[in-house]
């Protein structure tokens, strides 16, 4: 959500931003806000004028009574009563206008960074750089679900009977590697100076509305029936939500937090879930990182955060690349975002494993989060988030890139301490 004053003073900039995101249907929203804002400001001005007139009349009534001019005083009292009735009407209108404006403003996308490439959708995202040499295997690599089955490591049929498509049982060595990766990710981020957090796995509707657009909520979030609670789609939501309605002391910035949590998603978007596999599913686990910082520090943190993901994946011998998200691929709250994609030797292409985003002050504004500066003035912080790792999707890249021709999977050195020194796993 952008600043109302900015929209009022720069409507053409806001409209061009909407066009750059290929959301032309939202263009009328800008004029709607401007019209409602003008009406609200006129209402506020009239209310202020009436209050001033009321105060003036009240003083005059006292003077008239002191002079014995009772009839004139009574007439003025009637005038004050009429003004009071009108003032009550105006005061009732104010919150109505503000709520109408707020709801429309929530639908207007954030102003994207000037460095973001203009493009309609993810097909126009731009490769920035690669890290590690892509593997071209001399043997056939099975589809990941089939590969996991060779280690007795997955049961999709059982999960389908229990919960339907989009769920899984991981077992044995595959499950152990999953747990080892998450433990390693936790320690990796702690060593980067982040505070480890175990957050709530449910959030109130007001927090969900504060961290994402309504469209994203509808496509992603599971609501608890009869409760004002949603299952989190990522722990970013509950970690950022921790600071809602709070005044943060500037000297405590940056806030750098990392957490591991289950994530629950409807996946109602264009891709949907897989019939068989663990690439796009309803339930998974993820190590996340968030930063709350001064606006001027945000881009430095953005670059640090995505580089942490690259470093993490490279330590597991997985080649990756950075992909700059174009304007049309950015969610409405995002100022700038990039994906980290892992190499799939089986498919001979990259696929998304991490997403790093600078949200500007949008989440802070929605959640009423403020910072008290050293000079005593209040301002909105910037919020950023990034995936460290999200198994089991990451396991696809892990197994494919560490698979040998004899069917064994090599355990990278970084992971061995979390697997009791194990150096490889073998087919069952």
Feature-to-residue mapping (PLM):
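TRNA-recognition modules of translation machinery and tRNA-sensing kinases, especially anticodon-binding
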Residues: 27, 130-428
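N-terminal alpha-helical targeting/anchoring segments
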Residues: 1-134, 149, 153
């Amino acid at each position: 959500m952008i600043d109302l004053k900015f929209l009022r003073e720069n409507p053409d900039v806001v409209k061009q931003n909407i066009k750059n995101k290929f959301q032309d249907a939202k263009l009328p929203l800008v004029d709607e806000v401007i019209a409602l804002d003008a009406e609200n400001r006129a209402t506020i001005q009239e209310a202020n004028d009436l209050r001033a007139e009321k105060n003036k009349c009240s003083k005059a009534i006292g003077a008239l009574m002191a002079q014995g001019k009772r009839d004139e005083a009574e007439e003025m009292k009637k005038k004050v009563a009429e003004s009071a009735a009108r003032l009550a009407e105006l005061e009732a209108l104010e919150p109505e206008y503000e709520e109408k404006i707020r709801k429309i403003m929530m639908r207007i996308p954030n102003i994207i960074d000037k460095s973001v490439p203009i493009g309609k959708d993810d097909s126009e995202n731009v490769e920035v750089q690669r890290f590690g040499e892509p593997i071209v295997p001399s043997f056939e690599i099975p589809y990941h679900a089939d590969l996991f089955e060779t280690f007795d490591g997955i049961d999709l049929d059982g999960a389908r009977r229990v919960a339907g498509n989009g769920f899984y049982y991981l077992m044995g060595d595959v499950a152990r590697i999953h747990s080892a990766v998450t433990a390693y990710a936790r320690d990796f981020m702690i060593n980067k100076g982040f505070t480890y957090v175990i957050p709530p796995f449910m959030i109130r509707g007001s927090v969900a509305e504060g961290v994402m657009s309504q469209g994203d909520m509808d496509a992603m979030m599971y609501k608890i029936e009869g409760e004002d609670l949603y299952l989190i789609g990522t722990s970013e939501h509950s970690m950022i939500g921790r600071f809602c309605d709070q005044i943060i002391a500037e000297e405590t910035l940056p806030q750098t937090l990392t957490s591991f949590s289950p994530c629950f998603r409807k996946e109602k978007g264009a891709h949907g879930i897989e019939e068989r596999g663990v690439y796009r599913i309803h339930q998974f686990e993820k190590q996340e990182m968030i930063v709350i910082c001064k606006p001027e520090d945000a881009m430095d943190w953005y670059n640090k955060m995505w580089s942490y993901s690259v470093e993490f994946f490279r330590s597991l011998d997985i080649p990756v690349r950075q992909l700059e998200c174009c304007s049309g691929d950015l969610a409405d709250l995002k100022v700038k975002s990039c994906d980290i994609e892992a190499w799939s030797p089986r498919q001979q292409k990259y696929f998304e494993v991490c997403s790093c985003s600078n949200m500007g002050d949008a989440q802070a504004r929605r959640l009423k989060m403020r910072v008290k500066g050293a000079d005593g003035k209040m301002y909105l912080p910037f919020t950023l988030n990034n995936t460290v790792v999200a198994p089991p999707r990451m396991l696809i890249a892990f197994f494919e890139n560490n698979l040998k021709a004899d069917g064994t999977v090599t355990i990278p050195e970084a992971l061995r301490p979390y697997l009791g020194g194990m150096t490889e796993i073998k087919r069952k």
